[in-house]
Amino acid sequence: MSVLQVLHIPDERLRKVAKPVEEVNAEIQRIVDDMFETMYAEEGIGLAATQVDIHQRIIVIDVSENRDERLVLINPELLEKSGETGIEEGCLSIPKQRALVPRAEKVKIRALDRDGKPFELEADGLLAICIQHEMDHLVGKLFMDYLSPLKQQRIRQKVEKLDRLKARA
């Protein structure tokens, strides 16, 4: 397994729409494993393949405290959503920035697991929010797109400054 490079805004590759996975094979499973390794290394709770410049419909999530409840979503589809909620969300592609984002309180999805087996999942709370956040990535949408233009500009400037400082170090 290896840690992949996470793209940061304003990288336009984050805006690409991911294509469906045609076959879950050893290559896809390797990508899933690398994505988990990357997500844990970056201390995230979710990661979409788009964020690591792989434009396929793959998501990995682990919202557990012990980091031992891996969830793989390949070709996820939103079937139902209900209620309203929101938390201050962060994103590995928008480092050290957070903002309140409106989300559905509950979701029902269909996806393939790491072995290509179809399943359905009903989720609420943090897991439901994380699923929605990561599914947005698959269509090129970021949490900051829900914010006002002024807030978006401020976030972009802060991230660009952080990346410049990191490049000098």
UniProtKB/Swiss-Prot annotation:
UniProt catalytic activity: N-terminal N-formyl-L-methionyl-[peptide] + H2O = N-terminal L-methionyl-[peptide] + formate
Catalytic-site annotation from UniProt: 134
Alphabetized UniProt keyword annotations: Hydrolase, Iron, Metal-binding, Protein biosynthesis
Residues where Fe cation binds: 91, 133, 137
Keyword Protein biosynthesis applies: yes
Textual note on the cofactor: Binds 1 Fe(2+) ion.
Protein name: Peptide deformylase
Organism: Shigella boydii serotype 18 (strain CDC 3083-94 / BS512)
Gene name in the database record: def
